[in-house]
Amino acid sequence: MIICEIGLNHLGDEEYALEYVSKILSTDVDAITFQIRESDFYVDTYDSFILSDNFYRNIVEKIKNSNVLIGIALSDIKKIPFFDSLNIDFFKILNNV
């Protein structure tokens, strides 16, 4: 299984993130994982790295329509219900220490 994990390479730019995912989907990847970091990780620059909930709704649909698994890597388990409502295939819990 090949999993492509998308960390901060999008720098909060949703158009770039969409383009990035589209290029990944043109390969033989089996799954894509997005890392979700919390505000205390970024200190003052956090807001510039956030992708919107609407972006995640749309990108999950795009990935699932491509028959690729979608995962979310996060340390704030309070965010799981939102992503679970999008029918995420798997979760990866990050260490928040």
Predicted regions and their residues:
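Hydrophobic faces of well-ordered beta-strands that scaffold small-molecule active sites
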Residues: 2-6, 30-34, 70-73, 89-93
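Generic structural signal for well-ordered alpha-helices
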Residues: 21-25, 53-60, 80
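Catalytic beta/alpha-barrel core
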Residues: 48-51, 68-80, 89-97
